[in-house]
Amino acid sequence: MVARLGLANFLKEARGKRSSAEAAAVAGFSKATLSRVERGESVISPGDARLLMMHYGVPADVIESFADLAYAAKQPGWWQRYKSALPDWFSLFVGVESAAHRIRTYEPELIPGILQTPEYSRALVEKDIQVPSLEEQVQDAVSLRQRRQEKLTGEDPAEFRAVINESALYRQVGGPDTHQEQLEYLLTMGQRDNLSIRILPFTSGAHAASYGAFVLLDYTVVNKDYALAYVEYSGGALYLESEEEISLHSRIFDSLWQDAASPSETEGLIKDAIQRIS
């Protein structure tokens, strides 16, 4: 998926001010098809990618690197095995997340999906009216969240920062035992060198992200850096890529980080929440 998005971004940048009709004609397809390719919604063959890049005046060595991306973009990602519980609009996020070298997230109501225990995930999935109630789909949804955690715990893990609203510590998902296990797991994950988890306390008052959750993903394709802001809503998501949108969400996250509790205070807040579980 990240190969598709990287190729899409490069082709869009390389086209510059040339008309989409002119570029599409070079490769022998419609403006609509080119538009889908440049948005990362469709893939093209390595041959078509070469034709476009030659027309754009891209150097030969760069052409070959990005033509290889066109081939890679056609290969299924590991997440496709969970497709029974993977909406099309979420597939792009999982693909980019799996290739990201830095992940920043704000979550106001729940523990972020990538940090959830299996039982906590299951309790949420079983309440999600968008996920079919068949056990296979429920298990796929839970397994997908667990598999995503390898991005934080496997080889070459991503740098991860999370700001979690204090209210998420008190929303009892799945009952007392599941809730306690989740909070204890949050403490454990917070000890990893590549993870920084901060709680935004109630006492911090007004903050910069009152509109809701978001995720910032930083990734690299063929030595070129990209960023993506992800904002989810019921039944879909927004994928924001412009410099202005990335800058805005980065500033919002930095403000939240500044307002959040320190590492020691965060640990204390989580332990307090554990003690209050009845």
Model-derived segments and spans:
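Interdomain hinge/linker segments and adjacent boundary elements that couple functional modules
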Residues: V2-E13, S20-A25, R39, V43-Y170, ...
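Secondary-structure boundary motif
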Residues: G16, G154, T188-Q191
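A short, flexible beta-alpha/helix-coil linker loop
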Residues: K31, S167-Y170, G236
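C-terminal regulatory/effector modules of DNA-binding transcriptional regulators
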Residues: V163, G175-S278
